[in-house]
Every structure is written in C-alpha cells, then in structure tokens.
Amino acid sequence: MRPWTGSWRWIMLILFAWGTLLFYIGGHLVRDNDHPDHSSRELSKILAKLERLKQQNEDLRRMAESLRIPEGPIDQGPASGRIRALEEQLVKAKEQIENYKKQTRNGLGKDHEILRRRIENGAKELWFFLQSELKKLKNLEGNELQRHADEFLSDLGHHERSIMTDLYYLSQTDGAGDWREKEAKDLTELVQRRITYLQNPKDCSKAKKLVCNINKGCGYGCQLHHVVYCFMIAYGTQRTLILESHNWRYATGGWETVFRPVSETCTDRSGVYTGHWSGEIKDKNVQVVELPIVDSLHPRPPYLPLAVPEDLADRLVRVHGDPAVWWVSQFVKYLIRPQPWLEKEIEEATKKLGFKHPVIGVHVRRTDKVGTEAAFHPIEEYMVHVEEHFQLLARRMQVDKKRVYLATDDPSLLKEAKTKYPHYEFISDNSISWSAGLHNRYTENSLRGVILDIHFLSQADFLVCTFSSQVCRVAYEIMQTLHPDASANFHSLDDIYYFGGQNAHNQIAIYPHEPRTADEIPMEPGDIIGVAGNHWDGYSKGVNRKLGRTGLYPSYKVREKIETVKVPHVPEAEK
C-alpha cells in the first residue's frame, strides 16, 4: 500500500465530519422556524456563520484534492504543510462548533431583550403622547396654542432621541457591533483586492483597457465622480482603467502628483485595436476602449450605480443601510489614496485646526450653485439639525464642546456663524473659502482646499449639507469607508443621495396607500415606485411605474429595491 493512502482516508474522515457539522447547523436553522419570535439579527448572524463554514468546507475539499500525491513520504514537502493546515482548520472548526452550541443554547442575550422591550414600550408611549397632545391642541388658540405647540415639539424630540439611542445600543448587543466591524472590514479588503488585481495586469501590452480623460468641464467633486463612473464600467467589463490626467485643470502634472497612480504596472493606453464605447458585447474584441462622459454614454451598461455586484449583495444588505453608496465608496477609496506630501498636509491641518471629536460637519455651498442647481439655505437651517444631533450624541457620549467643522465657499459665513451661535466652536479655514471662489477655483491651492474640506467633513460624526453638491456627496461616500455603516449619518437639506448619470432609483411598496389629496398616488404592496426625492416631511415624491402616475406617498410605506448585477472576477484576485 502506498504511504499516502492512509492520509487520504483520514482526510475523507475529516470531510465527512465537516459535512455532518453543516447538516447539524442546517437542521438547527430549519427547527428555528418553529420559533418565529427569534430575532432576525440572530438569524443573519447564523447564516453568515454558515456561509463561512461552507467556504471552509470548499477550502478543505480543494486541499484534499491537492494531497493526492502518487508517491513519496508525507512527513515532508508540500503534503506535510497541507496536512498541518488541515489540522489547524479542524481546530478552528471545533471552536466554531462550541461557539455555535453556546449561542443556540443561551439564545438572545439579556441586554438585547431589555433593549427590544424598551424600544417597543417607547413606540407605544410615543403614540399615546401624540394622541393626547394633538387632542389638546384642538382646543387652544392664539399664544396658548403657540406655546403648547413649541412644548409639544420639544417633548416629541425627547421621545425620538430616546428611541434612537435604544436602537443604537441594540445594534451593538450580543456581539452584533463586533460582527458588523469584522464583516465590513472583510468586504472592503475583498473588494480592494479585486480592484488592485484588475488594475495591475502582469502584461500591460495584452491587457484589455478602458481609457478615461479626467478633464470633464466641471469642479473637483464632479470630476472625481466622473473618474469613479469610468472605474465602475472598467471593473464591470473587466478592463484596466487608464486615467488620462496630463494638463489636469487643477494640477497640470496630473492625478499622480496628488494621489497614488491608479496602476503600478499599466498606465500606457496603447493596444492593437482602439475604439469608442459601443457597448460591452460589440467591444468584446477591442483591446482599448475610450469612454465618453456619462451624459453621452450609449448603450448604458448595467454596471452603473445604483447596482451592486450580485455575489456581494446579500452580505452588503446585512451589514450596510445603503449598499449602492457603499459600492461607490470602494472606488472612491481606491482613487484618493494620497501621495506622501498630501498625507503630511492633512496631518498638519488636523493639528493646526484642532480638529477632534465629537464634531459635526456642515457644508454650505453658495456661489455658482445658488439659483441654478440649488436654493439658498441660511445657516439657521443647518444649525437646527446640528443641535438635534448633538442632543442625540449627548445621550451616549460626553460632549465637552459642540464643535462644527464649517466648509463653505462663502468667506463671510464663518463670522456670521460665530456671531449667531457663540456657544459652538466653529472649526474652519477661511483661506479655503476664498480659494473656492469662482475666480480661484481651478488652481492647485483650490484643489488642496477642497481636498482638506472633504477630508474633514468625511471624518465628522454627522454631516449636514445639501446633496445637490458633489463635494457633500463625496464626503458622504468617504464616510462609508471609515465606519461599518454610516448610511444614516447625514441630513440633506435638499436631495436624497444620487450619483450623476445613475440608472433608475426604484423602491418597492410594502404597504397599500389610498390617496387623501390630488397630490398623492395610490400604491399596493409590490408596486415599483421610481423615487424622485424625499420631502423630509414624511412624504416622498415619485412615479408608480405600474400606473404611470406621479405624486406623493408616505416614505415609510416603501423599501429600497436593491439592484444587482453579475460582475465577473478571477479567482486569483481572491487570494
């Protein structure tokens, strides 16, 4: 008998045991259906564990296949190393079995159930309060009505903050916060590996390429989003992005003088065949494809926002409140890796400004946006939401000072804000405001300023701005890369989040709605609603695609429709 035969039987025994483990867990998942009051969060964690176990089972199978060595001793060489790896996997499996047994035996933690009941009670008490106070308002007039309405809104705010605080703590109980941290980190590392692999082909002369010119006729935030759009198409079509940035309006030396190159091995656009974008299928045999701006893109591929990769969608839905934003943020993260001089600038600015937490970021865009793409918003509109969020933060952390990082292209606003709100500490660099003016916009000093503003806005605990501004949306996107889920860490005074040139943003009705006014539209569960915007008053505006009717509908009666797309990737990128 050959020496490897015994080892092979031993390996088969391990695989059999592993399969038994998967069957055991699967059985538990089925039996858990008899207890519908189990937390959906608990089920998500178990499913995530099962997915990891399946992956490890597949790893073991591949390792076992590789151990089919026809001859030679097994106590040395590659086979020996693989067997030791199998032993380590087995130890990990035993640990996971024990952890799972403890979890299923103990059920949900005490803190989880206490918080769940507190939230349930808080919702009931809020309803009782609303009914009572609104009945009182019916019988009041004049100054008494105004006084009672003000008290009513103040008390309502306390109720809302109480429930939101309990929800925050609930999201952290029973290891959920730790799981979310790890899952977000794992997903980010996976995507960054895939991007890095695609951007660094072994042979640039043979690589399929997509060429993108940075000089779109707009500002920094718009140009960055233009490159992100190019990058997402390159990723979806499995091409290496070639970024042409020589004579960039902001820095004539090009992108690489500010940020790290998008590729270490392939920056040359040359190839056998070159052509303009004609669609993924028609361009299949074209080595180098030039991409137009998104406004002129035809045909439109499915890789545009707000789609996310099909193979990541389930994990993203569990870990993040807005998977589409998270996916966009991964390309922003890769693109804006700073050169050493910029890193130093950011560090020095952080010390000079005294930037520290807690802090809320406020971005006020004036100049060219007002009257064209956005309405004028006084500082008071922003500060209402700043104060509300500081009151919420104070329920779970020590707020020594109410700090606000103020980014604006209006140099007079800092003085106005300090005068009107003396109890706040405003952190701002007025030289950046001056450089953001139209007459100074396309300079290296202006570029430095907008990069610093975006950096500090993204670092804030909460963001108040107008999503009609590209700078604000870039800051929000970067914020997603700094936390497991920062999807709710903002308030926009105008638009909901969008990506310029995106495909349709759809929602799905989960409750029926009968219109009460001519401005509203009817809905039935399952109807697809194309959302145009949120009015931030409990209602959104959109079109019922089944009926073709446009109007208002209650925002709580819909959920986001997650669009997925198959994106190919090579196994080598997973390593």
Swiss-Prot record:
Residues carrying Phosphoserine: S278
The protein's annotated pathway: Protein modification; protein glycosylation
Residue numbers on the Lumenal membrane side: 31-575
Catalytic activity as recorded in UniProt: N(4)-{beta-D-GlcNAc-(1->2)-alpha-D-Man-(1->3)-[beta-D-GlcNAc-(1->2)-alpha-D-Man-(1->6)]-beta-D-Man-(1->4)-beta-D-GlcNAc-(1->4)-beta-D-GlcNAc}-L-asparaginyl-[protein] + GDP-beta-L-fucose = an N(4)-{beta-D-GlcNAc-(1->2)-alpha-D-Man-(1->3)-[beta-D-GlcNAc-(1->2)-alpha-D-Man-(1->6)]-beta-D-Man-(1->4)-beta-D-GlcNAc-(1->4)-[alpha-L-Fuc-(1->6)]-beta-D-GlcNAc}-L-asparaginyl-[protein] + GDP + H(+)
Protein name according to UniProt: Alpha-(1,6)-fucosyltransferase
UniProt keywords, alphabetically: Disulfide bond, Glycosyltransferase, Golgi apparatus, Membrane, Phosphoprotein, SH3 domain, SH3-binding, Signal-anchor, Transferase, Transmembrane, Transmembrane helix
Motif SH3-binding, chain ranges: 299-305
Species name: Bos taurus
Domain SH3: 502-563
Family: Belongs to the glycosyltransferase 23 family.
GO cellular component: Golgi cisterna membrane
